[in-house]
Amino acid sequence: MASTTFSGPIKAGTISNTTGTTLGDNVKNVGQVVMTQSSNVALTHATTTATALGIIIPANSQIININIVVESLFTNSSTTTIAIGNATGTPTNIGAAHNVSATAVGPLKMLQASVGAWDNIGTSDIELFGIVVANSASAGKARIVVDYAQNNNLTAL
């Protein structure tokens, strides 16, 4: 199947700016199109150092969701965690460590590591890294999927 690449961000809607108070006529209804990227590297029970996931989030983007999709159960796991960060030295500053049990199949929704961590990733692209603290797991494999609004450029409320 053919694919098309846009430089983005992609927006949808018919009214770009609010000039009045009539919905459907002159009140802004344009919104961001949600983008998604999936890791091309598996996080396994043996991924004990920060590992690049092959996911690059464009500057000024708002992260909406980060999911862990288990592709092979984390055998014997009771306390295995997966965390996501934006550098090898800070592999836990984007997605807080999330427990992955021996029966978890997911998708498992991660939480942001700190208040506002997903609002706006900053003025430069970031590469995501994952790390696993296996503890008792003797097997297991997961993929990370990230949904984001490209160049949403949010400011604090």
Region spans (language model):
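Surface-exposed, low-hydrophobicity beta-strand/loop segments enriched in small/polar/acidic residues
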Residues: A2-L157
